[in-house]
Design a protein with these regions (language model features):
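Non-transmembrane "mature" sequence context
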Residues: 1-145
Length: 145
């Protein structure tokens, strides 16, 4: 016999899942995602090459096109990357004050995850998986783990 788990009913409605396979959903989310991304690029004082790597090694011409026309629809990979970066940015600003929160990504870090490298180096080299690891680390710090 399998145990049955009963959870109390929440008074909050669960958020609807967003289907990123849908072009309409990506078109709806992309402008605000890109606005957030370029704000982060500015706050973190990233070079174009670093920003391009965070978006998934896009070419210079593609990056310039995205920058000129931030209403372009992002593909699933890029919108996922931007989502992680926004989460990282938010977590940093919860954990630290403004100057440190924006400098943290470029600072060498002794945490085992970074091995003395900066979080930015890890994320540009490790892509989405590294972004997920950085976000998980920061979320754990926020919750006191």
């Amino acid at each position: 016999m399998n145990p049955v788990f009963v959870y109390p009913q929440s008074r909050f409605e669960s958020a609807a899942l967003i289907d990123l396979r849908s072009g309409e959903e990506r078109a709806r989310l992309s402008p605000s995602a890109l606005q957030g991304f370029f704000n982060i690029v500015q706050r973190w004082q990233l070079k174009n090459d670093e920003a391009r790597e965070l978006l998934g090694s896009v070419s210079s011409s593609t990056y310039c096109e995205i920058k000129k026309n931030p209403t372009n629809t992002l593909d699933v990979d890029r919108i996922t990357r931007v989502s992680y970066l926004i989460g990282i940015y938010k977590a940093l600003h919860v954990l630290y004050g403004d100057p440190l929160a924006d400098q943290w990504v470029k600072m060498p870090n002794t945490n085992m995850l970074f091995s003395g490298h900066s979080p930015l180096e890890l994320m540009t080299q490790g892509g989405i998986v590294a972004m997920q690891q950085v976000k998980t680390l920061l979320d754990s710090s926020r919750s006191g783990l």
